[in-house]
């Protein structure tokens, strides 16, 4: 019973102690090894360090904070002359694993890191080969600053880079070499496409130090996918702008005509607020999408102003406003209706009448009578009676003055005629005023309809032109 337990305990001790050859090899290598010493036999020569990046995933590119966050593996390779051995002397052991704090490692950091810990890589073991070559592949979540150009947002392309370099070793101590910029394990991002990448090494001398330092930069050229923004921002605004056009088809008598235009302006302001939350607070450039939204908002405000103007036309009358002058009448009641194939009730509107009206522009009345004129009826009879009474009354006055005859019957007759004349004159003037009021009101209402039709065409054309200009300015539309 005790024998199996004892054998299991001895086997466990053997596993914990590891291979005797590896233990002996580690002891031999670490004997006299100084971690702070550069691993080179000739101290005048630099240690050649190769650095590569295996990009796994683009986690986020924050436009608001101008930061790029990725998941990547770094691959460091260098040769440690103090860690070589002959495998046959150690039972053909060809490689060892060491913790990173046990061996010399280059103090290479990510210069443009914005992570709170600055160095966010995970400290994995180093692989030591018998030739002295060291492989070290620490994974990490790297967050770097990335200056964004938001002018073409959301049809934009951004260039971000990862700048690595030694913090203390100068160029004559560490020489950097380009490693692989690998995307074999890359997980595609839903918002960004990698269209180009490159690696370059630069030598720079800083003001703090007289020596030269090398750094290696891995650059990513990204292009934004536009489907999300086109579907959730651009398309709704275009549909909202259709309401601006449809607002001019509503009758000017409807009070909700102005309310519809104001609602459209408020809706566009909401989209502007959403866009401002997506872009950084910068005064260097205005995003293309912002230009489009502001233009649509301006068009909406302009449409609201014209709608108010149209309604003021519709409710005008002779008692409050003056009659149209010749140019307004010619443009709104003759030329524009002829151009738009519109016709005022009971009025001919063709090229001939347009020409005649233009030729008679110096006359005060250059338009034909409307449907409110009466050919025969009580009004005409009263008007004729007023003229007849006026003539008779003036003739009697003349006779009285000439003959100087003023008996009581004549005077009474004159008084009766005076009263009849005054009443008929009042009725005639009242009817003329009503007739004139109706004609003037009809002209203003027709002018309001004409302006509405002109705005319908003008704003439709304006929205189409603005949309085409914005689309042509974009570097690309679909990605």
Swiss-Prot record:
Q: What is its main location?
A: membrane
Q: Which Pfam families match?
A: Neur_chan_LBD, Neur_chan_memb
Q: Where in the cell is it found?
A: Cell membrane; Postsynaptic cell membrane
Q: Which residues lie on this side of the membrane: Cytoplasmic?
A: 252-257, 307-453
Residues folding into a coiled coil are none
Entry GO terms, CC: acetylcholine-gated channel complex; neuron projection; plasma membrane; postsynaptic membrane; synapse
List the Gene Ontology MF annotations in alphabetical order.
acetylcholine receptor activity; acetylcholine-gated monoatomic cation-selective channel activity; excitatory extracellular ligand-gated monoatomic ion channel activity; transmitter-gated monoatomic ion channel activity involved in regulation of postsynaptic membrane potential
Indicate yes or no for the key word Ubl conjugation: no
> What are the record keywords, sorted?
Cell membrane, Disulfide bond, Glycoprotein, Ion channel, Ion transport, Ligand-gated ion channel, Membrane, Postsynaptic cell membrane, Receptor, Signal, Synapse, Transmembrane, Transmembrane helix, Transport
**For this UniProt entry, which segments traverse the membrane?**
231-251, 258-278, 286-306, 454-474
State which tissues express it.
Expressed in interneurons, motor neurons, pharyngeal neurons and muscles.
Record's bilayer topology term: Multi-pass membrane protein
Disulphide-bridged cysteine pairs: 146-160, 208-209
**Role:** After binding acetylcholine, the AChR responds by an extensive change in conformation that affects all subunits and leads to opening of an ion-conducting channel across the plasma membrane. Activity is required in glutamatergic neurons to mediate nicotine-induced and nicotine-motivated behaviors.
> What does the similarity note say?
Belongs to the ligand-gated ion channel (TC 1.A.9) family. Acetylcholine receptor (TC 1.A.9.1) subfamily.
Q: What is this protein called?
A: Acetylcholine receptor subunit alpha-type acr-15
